[in-house]
């Protein structure tokens, strides 16, 4: 049996999407084995990097697949890859037990469109499965309080790295 610490991390992207007021997009997860309770079901968009795909290309694809958003400009990115481990009980269920957690390349983007562009219930015109049941704009510093606890350290680092975009 493979030990959890011997498994690789799943390569992913994370996105801090800022509106003009400097708040970030948070989506409330529909479901998943990682849920603890409703107060920790909010997160920023994220997703896997396909084989041969560049991280920024994956970021734009994932953003569209989860929110229908295309109207963005890049503000910056975290230089390092940020990783988190899944709790043991979740690691066996998520991704068929192939990964110990995720390693993420984080990007900051400014949303330049109209909120009517955002569609989390039928993202991509219904071409993609909904991952969120609700969304809102909130303060970047609050995101770590609202995310599932095992992702909190990553969100705190993202907040430090991208704080300058929250007050433009």
UniProtKB/Swiss-Prot annotation:
InterPro entries hit by this protein: Nudix_hydrolase, NUDIX_hydrolase-like_dom_sf, NUDIX_hydrolase_dom, RppH
Cofactor: a divalent metal cation
Coiled coil: none
Enzyme class: hydrolase
Motif (Nudix box): 47-68
One example GO MF annotation: guanosine-3',5'-bis(diphosphate) 3'-diphosphatase activity
Keywords: Hydrolase
GO biological process, any: ribose phosphate metabolic process
Signal peptide positions (record): none
Segments forming domain Nudix hydrolase: 8-160
Enzyme Commission number(s): 3.6.1.-
Gene3D superfamilies per the UniProt record, alphabetical: Nucleoside Triphosphate Pyrophosphohydrolase
Function of the protein: Accelerates the degradation of transcripts by removing pyrophosphate from the 5'-end of triphosphorylated RNA, leading to a more labile monophosphorylated state that can stimulate subsequent ribonuclease cleavage.
UniProt-listed NCBIfam families: PRK00714.1-5 (NF001938)
Family the UniProt entry places it in: Belongs to the Nudix hydrolase family. RppH subfamily.
Protein name: RNA pyrophosphohydrolase
